[in-house]
Regions:
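Basic/polar N-terminal segments that are highly enriched at the extreme N-terminus
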Residues: 1, 19-20, 160-161
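Bacterial N-terminal signal peptides that target proteins for export
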Residues: 1-7
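Short, functionally important structural connectors and interaction interfaces within domains
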Residues: 6, 20-21
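Hydrophobic helical h-region of N-terminal Sec-dependent signal peptides
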Residues: 8-12
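N-terminal signal peptide c-region/cleavage motif recognized by signal peptidases
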Residues: 15-17
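Central antiparallel beta-sheet cores of small beta-barrel/beta-sandwich binding domains
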Residues: 23, 30, 36-118, 122-128, ...
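Low-complexity, intrinsically disordered Gly/Pro/Thr-rich segments
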Residues: 133-144
Length: 161
């Protein structure tokens, strides 16, 4: 009886997407995403930023995310992320806006990344994936010379498929 019960439980888990799939950065960024956030720069008015992204996972497991970022009063920016899991829970990659690597961890549905922008601003970012894997809370802290110069609070949503 035990093998039958085990088989039945396994079949139920595989048949139920909510139970079988846990959120992951690879699944979240595969396809189209949209994001919005409030950027607060020291001694400036808050601005609303928006982005649109198209992501895919390459054969080697690298997640490639092409983004278009729009900010009031600034030209539209295109950028590309390339992220790859290097060990369980460890992420490394590149961002076209950054100098040097993007380093991160993924645990408890939170992707935590650190990188340095080309102008020397250090960025720390947390993306907290929802349990259903369809949206993420986005928090970013920007530092220059060790001082926080800006923050961003927002969200990213996957396009329904």
């Amino acid at each position: 009886m035990f093998p039958r019960t085990l088989f039945a439980v396994a079949a139920l888990l595989l048949a139920s997407p909510a139970l079988a799939e846990t959120p992951s950065p690879e699944r979240f960024f595969d396809g189209e995403t949209t994001g919005t956030g409030t950027l607060k720069v020291m001694m400036s008015k808050a601005k609303t930023l928006t982005d649109r992204g198209t992501g895919r996972t390459e054969r080697d497991g690298t997640v490639v995310l092409d983004q278009i970022v729009e900010e009031p009063g600034a030209p539209t920016r295109k950028r590309q992320w390339r992220l790859r899991q290097t060990a369980p829970g460890k992420i490394e990659g590149t961002l076209s806006d950054a100098k040097g690597p993007v380093i991160g961890e993924f645990a408890n549905n939170v992707l935590h990344m650190r990188y340095t922008m080309k102008d020397g601003v250090k960025v720390e970012q947390w993306l907290r994936l929802s349990p259903d894997g369809q949206q993420a809370a986005n928090r970013m802290v920007f530092k220059k010379y060790g001082m926080t110069v800006a923050t961003l609070e927002g969200s990213v949503r996957r396009k329904a498929r």
